[in-house]
């Protein structure tokens, strides 16, 4: 199963992610894809570089690339992806038949 988490800041996404993690799910976020690309290109993962790296990856490979990179990394494994931000990321993740998107909210 592939679970995507979305929601506002401080909504509890990390708590939900940790719950899945204790049950053996792998975890990741779209920013992990950017960090990986930065590392491969010997670029420091500063906030500024994460932002510009994400823009560059989307420009070169399309708006769903960050999610597509995670799909490749998780290849059929049970996993949870934190901080899904765009419809294009959801569309890319739906390529897996076992994908579900959860919106996390808290009062």
PLM feature spans:
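P-loop (Walker A) phosphate-binding loop of NTP-binding proteins
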Residues: 8, 20
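Conserved lysine of the Walker
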Residues: 13
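ATP-dependent small-molecule kinase phosphotransfer cores
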Residues: 25-79, 84-91
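Conserved phosphate-donor/acceptor-positioning beta-strand/loop module used by diverse small-molecule
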Residues: 82-84, 93-107
